[in-house]
Amino acid sequence: MKKSMLLVISLLTYCSVFAQSVKFDTLSLDQAFERAKAEGKFVFVDVTASWCGPCQLMLEEVLSRKDVGEFCNKQFICIQMDVDKLEGKDFKKKYGVNSIPTFFILQEDGTVRHRLRGARRPEDFLAWAKRGVNETSSLFFLNNLLEE
């Protein structure tokens, strides 16, 4: 009985912590675009590597926060691109990633809507993500405004 109770408590704790953080789907970029289109969301990409200290810091201190997780999980299909794996290498080349961590908010057609290089404090990261969703403050909108 003790073991069963401990297992249940452990499982509940794990689930509550997991639900609070950014939920990264194990999808290819193309699959993420398809899901984003179907769900009316943008694609959030965390370009990372297992050996990258600032990347791990962002994962542990920012992307694990409840407020960040709730916002990102509601607005985005979230995936990670490991620069040491084939798809990550291709992504890095296609989107001109020259440092990590780098974060992208992409439209369903692959257009960069918003981009962030480097680690940030949680409140700064969340403000960046909110600007990326906002039509008139996204990098995409501002670049188009300059071109007109």
Per-region residue spans from a language model:
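Oxidative protein folding and maturation machinery
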Residues: 141-148
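Short pre-active-site segment immediately N-terminal to redox-active cysteine/selenocysteine motifs
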Residues: 40-43, 47-51, 99
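Conserved redox-active cysteine motifs that mediate thiol-disulfide chemistry
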Residues: 47-63
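Thiol-based oxidoreductase modules, predominantly thioredoxin-like and allied folds used
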Residues: 22-27, 65-87, 105
